[in-house]
Amino acid sequence: YLHEIALLGMRTADLHTSLMRSHEPSFNAQPFSLADRRRLTVRLVASARDAFDRLDARQSALSSDAAADAATLLRRRGAVLDLLQRLDRLSIDVHAIRCHNNYHLGQILRTEHDFVIVDFARPPGMEAPVVLRTGFFRKMLRRLAPPVRPAPDGKGLALVDVATMLRSLSAATATAHHAFLVRRPGEAARIAKWVACWEVWTSAAFLTAYLDRAADPPYLPADERQLRQLLAAFVLDTTLDELRHYVDRRPDRAYIPLSAALSLTRQLD
């Protein structure tokens, strides 16, 4: 299975490189400017504030365990916002490119020996392919796809696609873990360490293969510290966006992004 995840990482790098190398002028990579960085920071901070506000307002709709986790996460609000605001002081040397902008496991079709990436941003009114409108695929998308914002106009940072896929892998793992415990609740302690190990290894396989395949392109920061900071911020942003969605629409499933957000912010205590 790790080989399959690594292949997905390589195909993601191929996607970004292909989008950057298009002969269409509108696909040319462009430097990520100081103004771009400031707009990014403002958006991330505003989105995080909104997620915390909604979580605070909807705690009563959560289960007792989820409400306790929510209270813990809310105590980290200030530290999370400080972390995101630091991006404005980060001198990012990277180029923006056309990206998928809605990238998760629900957008991946498995062929016999490879993957096909589908459902790029479409013009208004254009429907998805028929196969993706069938009941099976609609159900798959609901289960595997964390909600994302509409694709922004213009170009963005490729690491956003990487972050949303990493979050999707995490959400799929958490969903399978929960389904297992419903059937075998007595094995919670035994299985927890294996679930954590599985998530770490799948994420590492995807990210390592992606970075190796991309091979220092202009759409990734050459500085490893910058790359780590940006990716961590985007994964956290995606997780909080997912949390906001579930708190509003599916509070019974809010435990999935809540648990992930707690894990991502644990070092901030």
Predicted features and spans:
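Conserved catalytic-loop position in the HRD/HxD motif
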Residues: 102, 107
